[in-house]
UniProtKB/Swiss-Prot annotation:
Pathway: Glycan biosynthesis; starch biosynthesis. It comes from the Eukaryota. GO terms for molecular function: alpha-1,4-glucan glucosyltransferase (ADP-glucose donor) activity; alpha-1,4-glucan glucosyltransferase (UDP-glucose donor) activity. GO terms for biological process: starch biosynthetic process. The lineage of its organism: Eukaryota, Viridiplantae, Streptophyta, Embryophyta, Tracheophyta. The keyword NADP does not apply. This is Granule-bound starch synthase 2, chloroplastic/amyloplastic. May be the main starch synthase responsible for the incorporation of phosphorylated precursors into growing alpha-1,4-glucans. It comes from Solanum tuberosum. It catalyses: [(1->4)-alpha-D-glucosyl](n) + ADP-alpha-D-glucose = [(1->4)-alpha-D-glucosyl](n+1) + ADP + H(+). NCBIfam families: glgA. Belongs to the glycosyltransferase 1 family. Bacterial/plant glycogen synthase subfamily. Residues 253-262 have a biased composition (Acidic residues).
Amino acid sequence: MENSILLHSGNQFHPNLPLLALRPKKLSLIHGSSREQMWRIKRVKATGENSGEAASADESNDALQVTIEKSKKVLAMQQDLLQQIAERRKVVSSIKSSLANAKGTYDGGSGSLSDVDIPDVDKDYNVTVPSTAATPITDVDKNTPPAISQDFVESKREIKRDLADERAPPLSRSSITASSQISSTVSSKRTLNVPPETPKSSQETLLDVNSRKSLVDVPGKKIQSYMPSLRKESSASHVEQRNENLEGSSAEANEETEDPVNIDEKPPPLAGTNVMNIILVASECAPWSKTGGLGDVAGALPKALARRGHRVMVVAPRYDNYPEPQDSGVRKIYKVDGQDVEVTYFQAFIDGVDFVFIDSHMFRHIGNNIYGGNRVDILKRMVLFCKAAIEVPWHVPCGGVCYGDGNLVFIANDWHTALLPVYLKAYYRDNGIMNYTRSVLVIHNIAHQGRGPLEDFSYVDLPPHYMDPFKLYDPVGGEHFNIFAAGLKTADRVVTVSHGYSWELKTSQGGWGLHQIINENDWKLQGIVNGIDTKEWNPELDVHLQSDGYMNYSLDTLQTGKPQCKAALQKELGLPVRDDVPLIGFIGRLDPQKGVDLIAEAVPWMMGQDVQLVMLGTGRRDLEQMLRQFECQHNDKIRGWVGFSVKTSHRITAGADILLMPSRFEPCGLNQLYAMKYGTIPVVHAVGGLRDTVQPFDPFNESGLGWTFSRAEASQLIHALGNCLLTYREYKKSWEGIQTRCMTQDLSWDNAAQNYEEVLIAAKYQW
């Protein structure tokens, strides 16, 4: 025993028992070495007595010092490897495409990885590794590597938790030996393998340093055995095969890490392979120009389509010196009524959409009255607008690149741009140009059709044989010129702004003389309910509610924010500030179509109900005068604002308790959507889009979003409004429930944009 020293075990899995280690004078293990040539470690009984068989004190101290130095080196190496593991994990996690298929295979003989996981280090495993498969090495150091440190075990626990989610692919293995000099260099791509377990005898275990498995992190299923069973694999061919496998695994890992991976890679567009170039053409576009819902649609729908991955442009007239659009430098000349008219294109890129404005002396200085002038003047403006708009994809280099006519779809809106599908066919398709360009015509209000005498055909500058699509027979006025009729016949697809309105258009009452054409083209007609711009119309973000006593609010702060906005509105308009009085609002065009006359008939009844009424709008002169008269007669209860103000419309929507929309017909309607977003309850005539968007309140099931009436009569309006006021005063919980349902709806344009996309795809593949 003179060549033995007494050591204390540092293994965390076993008690601190002294170990008696045999120190041979010289040990060289080669292929075919016997078991006697291995180091032998025997457990000895721990006694507090000095052993005569132990080495001298000096030899023990020297051996212990050498062991400590070795331990420090191995610990340092382990810490370095753990740091490299963390760095490698970041790289692996960024390789998204390889994570799903990150499965290795593990074979105990060949060293491959299969169905294994990080072993459970909480079990009481013995970390000694016996093996009869001797790897040829020489000059083995006299001291045994220490057991795995606590830091290493803790790090493995962390790695196991991380890999459960990451499912990282197997990495290259590195051999760690306890030779006199650590000859292997650990690269940044190598990681650690947990040493497997060996069957233990009651008194002794064998440790073959050279047969330790390389330390590698492996994902997968739970390991079946912490140690591979002992094998008698000593052939040189097996060792060579194993080395080749290790080199191959390392090369594959190197290739994976060297491949550049873009961490910020964008996901594919929502439109998938159906991404198109879309140009929406409208006579108005919010916030630059707006008289109704058409301007809102032109300002919001393109942004939703752009979010789906399409390249989108909006083309509108430049009625004023807008600050955002800049002169593109492109100028063109078009003939209108035999005269040359020069146009200039102004361009801006906002929220992923190209906005192009056509500037001409025919559009300038019209101001708010964008449809002003006589019938012929309006027709000439629209002829110029459509001629210039259809050539925008060729002439205006948005972002440095023109749209071109490939994979292109035009979206025309109402009669103002109904000439566009006609020009597309007459000027281009009939001449073999833009054969794959499609057009979709959207009906916002079929009551306005661009009607006139047949002589107006001379202004549109078309070949004589195109006269027939414009002809329409009216039982009252006889045969006449109709632009909307020609657009409906030549467009590839037709869209209405609600499902209810698409049904009404097919009737003689709702089709306004065009119902026969619509029924003949029913196969290409589809109704799509409008959405709203949830950035502009959002009580939490509304910039118009950030001053003058108003405040932004959400569903959580509705009970405090909305009363404050109501008080601020009453104060701003000079009405008595009373929280208990229902405040009723109306926002819209002063026109019989909007049911303003029904409100006028119901005003005497309203004034007897202790309510306040605020009306905002412009339109017919007699109805504007009626508004002023109501304010004079009921100065403490009614306010009439003749004109239109975006700020005031937002504040009325936020401050009012109830919104009236008694329209005789309403293709879609947006004000009821704005009102519901702000927790203002709508009372509407159940027509068109109002029927689609406002579900009647059901007090028995606590469902519904407002009140509706079926006939355009003052008595019907009074009945619905009376039930609404009763609920407001007597059933607060039901009222708050209606507000909650209104405010939690998804009213964004995203759903509508997806439906529009389906229509555009159908037009694209139409032959």
